[in-house]
Amino acid sequence: MQQLNPSEISEIIKKRIENLDVSSDAQNEGTIVSVADGIVLIHGLADVMYGEMIEFPGGVYGIALNLERDSVGAVVLGKYQDLVEGQKVKCTGRILEVPIGPELLGRVVDALGNPIDGKGAINAKLTDKVEKVAPGVIERQSVDQPIQTGYKAIDAMVPIGRGQRELIIGDRQIGKTALAIDTIIAQKDSGIKCVYVAIGQKQSTIANVVRKLEEAGAMEYTTVVAAGASDPAAMLYIAPYTGCTMGEYFRDRGEDALIIYDDLTKQAWAYRQISLLLRRPPGREAYPGDVFYLHSRLLERASRVNVDYVEKFTNGEVKGKTGSLTALPIIETQGGDVSAFVPTNVISITDGQIFLETSSFNAGIRPAMNAGISVSRVGGAAQTKIVKKLGGGIRLALAQYRELAAFAQFASDLDEATRKQLEHGKQVTELMKQKQFSPMSVADMGVVLYAANDGFLEDVETSKIGSFETALLSYMNSEHTDLMADINKTGNFNGEIEATFKAAIEKFKATQTW
């Protein structure tokens, strides 16, 4: 055994003392003063940013929302029941970020981007901030490319363009979610990536939506962000921003994306709850003063960005492409009251609204859209040529029918022209009905709208309109396959196509096979 002499021992001790790290590791720490309903009051955090992530004991995180002179109000993202007064908390120096990228397609995640579908970890290469500033005026481009919803009533009367914000508004249980899900399914061959944000919904409802998307083969280009009814209010508040950040990944790289917020009423309720617990002064309907900004800063992020923006963002990797993020926010009204605080706010922020009404839904008209109140402020420029040319007469026919139907209730005898107009309105109303999960192609819409506009429905009984439409489309797709494929590709409509349509429909009507 080797012996150490005293001088060597002293040298080793000297070296150990010299190499000892005595520098202090400064950490910004505070103490929990109170915990209540997911809101934590912290004393002693000196340098904390607004929106900064705060680390609590047990690996739970929160966001600093109230910065006061001697305390910080934070909202907990997760389980707060284990937090106790007197525990130490730390600042992280980071703003909340979530995973982004194509790896999220086909997955169901929570409001923080954690997978909740049991399919394993998401190996996303990138993360991005949840709260971001919307593109500026110079970076935007006007909307001139269409997004097909697959609903003839909407694509003809309330067209939606890529980069638009179109509100879907109506009472509960009248098909708002169904309309949004069908729009996602209709994007199958368009290359548009979709994000569906479920806010405050039942877990069974979210599971049903995911199942429907999987059955339709739509999950492969869709990400579902789920903040269920049993999740903390903070998750419901943050979920739309998380989904928006995931959608912006595609927009900023010269691709097109669609995001659905289902629904923003519940996000406003969650934010109201958080604000009241943080003791912020309540305003109209007990909402805080910045509830307009809550939705405006979210919806302004949906936009169409120009070629320069995409080129600059990708450092020249993507050239000559514009990107877009189209938003379909959903707002739930109570008793059809669109003049309530949150509905009026969102109507003023968006580029139009699709108003669904209970009376139409109960009468069997689905989608239950009110053609008079529903409007698209910018989508007209994006409409496909064939639908734009043939769809104009539909809105007029429905508007006149609505007016005359109200008048006809009180009039006993009507002249022939009025009776004809009423009958035509009835037929168009019947024609605009469409089953769920059956989106229509542009060519199919063109055929149906042409038949309605050019009087081919006059001698068809109203009760047989549905079977007439099905048989006509089946005939057109089998007898004129190339023409229908060409219309789907180009969206064109000219004299030659019109003549073909006319001859084909006349030939079909002669068969009487419907």
Curated annotation (Swiss-Prot):
Molecular function per GO: ADP binding; ATP binding; proton-transporting ATP synthase activity, rotational mechanism
Top-level lineage group: Bacteria
Compartments where located: Cell inner membrane
Family matches, as InterPro entries: ATP_synth_asu-like_sf, ATP_synth_asu_C, ATP_synth_asu_C_sf, ATP_synth_F1_a_nt-bd_dom, ATP_synth_F1_asu, ATPase_F1/V1/A1_a/bsu_N, ATPase_F1/V1/A1_a/bsu_N_sf, ATPase_F1/V1/A1_a/bsu_nucl-bd
GO cellular component, as recorded: plasma membrane; proton-transporting ATP synthase complex
Sequence similarity: Belongs to the ATPase alpha/beta chains family.
Assembly description: F-type ATPases have 2 components, CF(1) - the catalytic core - and CF(0) - the membrane proton channel. CF(1) has five subunits: alpha(3), beta(3), gamma(1), delta(1), epsilon(1). CF(0) has three main subunits: a(1), b(2) and c(9-12). The alpha and beta chains form an alternating ring which encloses part of the gamma chain. CF(1) is attached to CF(0) by a central stalk formed by the gamma and epsilon chains, while a peripheral stalk is formed by the delta and b chains.
Protein's UniProt name: ATP synthase subunit alpha 2
